[in-house]
Amino acid sequence: ASAAGAVRAGDDETLLKPVLNSLDNLVSGL
């Protein structure tokens, strides 16, 4: 499960979505 997917489950953490999406992209690129 991706970090972004976990955040999508909680609307209270909307501000973290862009950050975690970026982290997911970085991890995928490794």
From Swiss-Prot:
Q: Work out whether the entry's keyword set contains Secreted.
A: yes
Name the tissues where it is expressed.
Expressed by the skin dorsal glands.
Lineage: superkingdom? Eukaryota
Q: Which GO terms describe its biological process?
A: defense response
**Which keywords describe this protein according to UniProt?**
Amidation, Amphibian defense peptide, Secreted
Record localization: Secreted
Q: What is its main location?
A: secreted
Q: Name one GO cellular component term.
A: extracellular region
According to the UniProt record, list the residues that bear Leucine amide.
30
Q: What's this protein's family per the entry?
A: Belongs to the frog skin active peptide (FSAP) family. Rothein subfamily.
Q: What does this protein do?
A: Lacks antimicrobial activity. Does not inhibit the formation of NO by neuronal nitric oxide.
Q: What is this protein called?
A: Rothein 3.1
Q: What is the native source organism of this protein?
A: Litoria rothii (Roth's tree frog)
